[in-house]
Swiss-Prot record:
It comes from Neovison vison. The keyword Kinase does not apply. GO terms for biological process: cytoplasmic translation. This is Small ribosomal subunit protein eS26. The gene is RPS26. Belongs to the eukaryotic ribosomal protein eS26 family. Component of the 40S small ribosomal subunit. It is found in: Cytoplasm, Cytosol; Cytoplasm; Rough endoplasmic reticulum. The lineage of its organism: Eukaryota, Metazoa, Chordata, Craniata, Vertebrata. PANTHER family: 40S RIBOSOMAL PROTEIN S26. The keyword ATP-binding does not apply.
Length: 41
């Protein structure tokens, strides 16, 4: 399989689980480390 990026677009690493956050310009629930901080409401 191709792998887009090594960290899957997240800042997690050794953490195992991060709580989702209501995120970005869309009202989607996204893991806290994956949400682009610019748009976080």
């Amino acid at each position: 399989m191709t792998k887009k990026r090594r960290n899957n677009g997240r800042a997690k690493k050794g953490r195992g689980h991060v709580q989702p956050i209501r995120c970005t310009n869309l009202a989607r629930c996204v893991p806290k480390d994956k949400a682009i901080k610019k748009f976080v409401s």
